[in-house]
Amino acid sequence: MAMSPKLNRNMPTFSQIWDYERITPASAAGETLKSIQGAIGEYFERRHFFNEIVTGGQKTLYEMMPPSAAKAFTEAFFQISSLTRDEIITHKFKTVRAFNLFSLEQQEIPAVIIALDNITAADDLKFYPDRDTCGCSFHGSLNDAIEGSLCEFMERQSLLLYWLQGKANTEISSEIVTGINHIDE
């Protein structure tokens, strides 16, 4: 673990963690115990989703989940891939078990949704080529992991609103970012 210096007096330091064997970098803002714990959590989250996803069998979307969820996944994959709905509906995806944030029940989902490597679900990459860990969380407590997942999900939705609208609710002063007119405490 390393602590990176501040970019300027108003910016926080960063707690950074690297795993040279697995090439899994992670970081969090700050140098408090909470930020160090955050960096460790990010590290385990990335390590898990890059290196430790173990898939189950292969199933179609309608074999692994309720019809309403399968329909939603079909529409999402249709929007982000160049495949037809029929190709999506008939494809057998590698599966993993996950928690549904809305019902808190376990269900199977396509492994390509959470596996960040290009090997685990190689045959499924054409359906979901750009992946991240949005809505995923690592924690020693199941309840805290679910809460973290919900926060990750809300963070993504907020970023999407910002990107789609092209404006933020609050503008950060350039004087704060550059350190101009900074008064030390």
Model-derived features: where do they sit?
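Helix-coil modules at protein/domain termini and other flexible surface or pore-lining loops
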Residues: 1-185
